[in-house]
């Protein structure tokens, strides 16, 4: 080991609980959420925009593009090509064990993220690739990636040698060519705002949303986001 860092206030959250909690809070503030509602087209409409969706057309004066790996597809509807890609990766969960790891373990050199959930199951990841399937939004588990990921995890936490796996699931994460977020108003498309954070969307989502809300409301964002404008990709 060449070096390490310890962050005593490093946090972790269960997205299966955190995401519905955010949605419930938004509804209490007046938001209307349309689940499983795909945007199939987006175009200027008078002084605003019109989105064609599975629930019918929706008109809005302002649009926030926070579609993750699909953000590039949405921006392309407005004639703006952004280097946003979806990458299939996978995560493994084990049976419950005694408490061993109280914090998030991040092993950059070995491609490993590892933590224990509240019920003491281990969650093992690290960006290992899943397989692409016929449906781009439905990746499949890659057995070789699973074995390689577990090899690193067992080296770092030997207790895993006697722990059974329960399941493995793949998903799509979003990335940009320069690994930087895309935030702020889309150049040449007034009223359209980007809120896209690559690779760590769940972690950075709340702050990205806060900064985006400030910009949408015409306020100066509390952090300077000029370097993250989509203008860096546009001629």
Residue ranges and their predicted role:
Residues 4-25, 68-70, 145-152, 197-204, ...:
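Mid-domain beta-loop-alpha active-site segment that forms a flexible
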Residues 5-62, 70:
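Helical element adjacent to the flavin cofactor pocket in flavoenzyme catalytic cores
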Residues 15, 154-235:
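C-terminal catalytic lobe of FAD-dependent flavoproteins
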Residues 25, 29, 77, 215-219:
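Active-site catalytic microenvironments for nucleophilic, acid-base chemistry
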Residues 98-190:
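Active-site lid/adjacent beta-loop-alpha segment flanking the redox-cofactor pocket in flavoenzymes
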């Amino acid at each position: 080991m060449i070096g390490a860092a310890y962050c005593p206030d490093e946090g972790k959250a269960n997205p299966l609980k955190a995401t519905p909690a955010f949605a419930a809070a938004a509804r209490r503030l007046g938001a209307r959420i349309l689940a499983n509602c795909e945007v199939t087209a987006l175009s200027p409409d008078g002084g605003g925009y019109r989105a064609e969706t599975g629930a019918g057309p929706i008109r809005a004066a302002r649009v926030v593009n926070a579609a993750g790996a699909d953000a590039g597809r949405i921006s392309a509807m407005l004639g703006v090509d952004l280097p946003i890609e979806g990458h299939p990766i996978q995560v493994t969960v084990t049976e419950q064990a005694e408490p061993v790891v109280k914090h998030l373990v991040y092993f950059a050199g070995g491609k490993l993220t590892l933590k224990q959930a509240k019920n003491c199951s281990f969650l093992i990841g690290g960006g290992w690739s899943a397989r692409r399937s016929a449906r781009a939004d439905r990746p499949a588990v890659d057995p070789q990636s699973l074995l390689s990921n577990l090899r690193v995890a067992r080296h770092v936490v030997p207790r895993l040698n006697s722990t059974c796996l329960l399941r493995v699931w793949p998903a799509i994460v979003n990335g940009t060519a320069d690994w930087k977020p895309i935030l702020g108003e889309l150049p040449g498309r007034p009223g359209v705002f980007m809120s896209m954070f690559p690779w760590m969307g769940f972690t950075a989502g709340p702050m990205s949303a806060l900064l985006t809300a400030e910009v949408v409301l015409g306020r100066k964002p509390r952090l300077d986001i000029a370097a993250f404008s989509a203008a860096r990709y546009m001629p």
